[in-house]
């Protein structure tokens, strides 16, 4: 294996590891040819010089990730599932506690003005533009070229790309603060962080975390209560015909929590709409 070491630009939590893998395909049988992860404020990258080294790489990953929170981008669906499968193959018992920033971005996708949720797109959303790098789709071609020519420049390209993926992953720590800022509101000088929003029978239900306890207030528009750092908000709506094709639920503009795409009349907030069946 060829090993690369790069310094991180921020001091990292020693109980957290940022991880990204490169493979020769998307199936569970595809060889893992490269792994990049953080350790002691460094980004460590290993690239296989031959496919038989995969088991050695799995043993390294197991040792480094054990008992740590693993941060990935789409890792819950790919990287970690693949490691589980490889662990069964090589008799390595992978157990993961993970944070997947792709799942966070997907859940709150309406907060991001971006064309898609690819890692590179989200990096640009937060202001990170990569230095010269190959595309992820070129990794397989590079490795095949290495196997044919034994020219290590191809390993270097893969190692750099893998390392930059982890560098970008660290940068995407900003997602947490961004989402918290966008999903928070203040009431009576207390902070409320929205975790769930549901709509049922003309009532909007909002739940989340707060630094307030033993709070209760209600009027004709909404009811809010807080207990043991959890809050529960119910917003009571009115339903009417917006035009001949669209009905809407609305409240008079007093408390603003959620807004529809369609234009609202003055002093009224339309926050849910749907087409009337033709």
Residue positions per predicted region:
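DEDD superfamily 3′-5′ metal-dependent exonuclease/proofreading module
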Residues: 1-19, 24-32, 37-278
């Amino acid at each position: 294996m060829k090993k690369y070491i790069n310094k991180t630009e921020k001091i990292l939590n020693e109980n957290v590891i940022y991880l990204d893998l490169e493979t020769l395909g998307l199936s569970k049988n595809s060889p893992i040819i490269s792994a990049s992860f953080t350790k002691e404020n460094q980004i460590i990258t290993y690239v296989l010089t031959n496919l038989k080294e995969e088991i050695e790489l799995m043993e390294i990953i197991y040792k480094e990730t054990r008992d740590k929170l693993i941060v990935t981008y789409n890792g819950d669906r790919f990287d970690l599932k693949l490691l589980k499968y490889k662990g069964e193959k090589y008799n390595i018992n992978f157990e993961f506690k993970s944070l997947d920033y792709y799942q966070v971005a997907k859940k709150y996708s309406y907060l991001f003005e971006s064309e898609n949720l690819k890692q590179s797109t989200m990096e640009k959303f937060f202001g990170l533009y990569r230095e010269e790098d190959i595309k992820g789709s070129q990794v397989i071609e590079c490795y095949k070229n290495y196997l044919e020519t034994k020219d290590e420049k191809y390993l270097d390209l893969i190692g750099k790309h893998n390392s930059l993926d982890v560098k970008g992953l660290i940068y995407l720590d900003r997602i947490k603060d961004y989402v918290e800022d966008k999903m928070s509101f203040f009431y009576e000088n207390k902070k409320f962080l929205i975790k769930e929003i549901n709509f049922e029978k003309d009532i909007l239900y909002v739940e989340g975390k707060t630094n307030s306890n033993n709070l209760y207030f209600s009027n004709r528009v909404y009811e809010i209560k807080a207990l043991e750092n959890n809050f529960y908000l119910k917003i009571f709506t009115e339903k009417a015909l917006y035009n001949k094709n669209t009905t809407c639920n609305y409240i008079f503009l007093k408390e603003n929590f959620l807004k529809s795409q369609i234009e609202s009349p003055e002093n009224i907030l339309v926050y849910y709409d749907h087409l009337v069946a033709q």
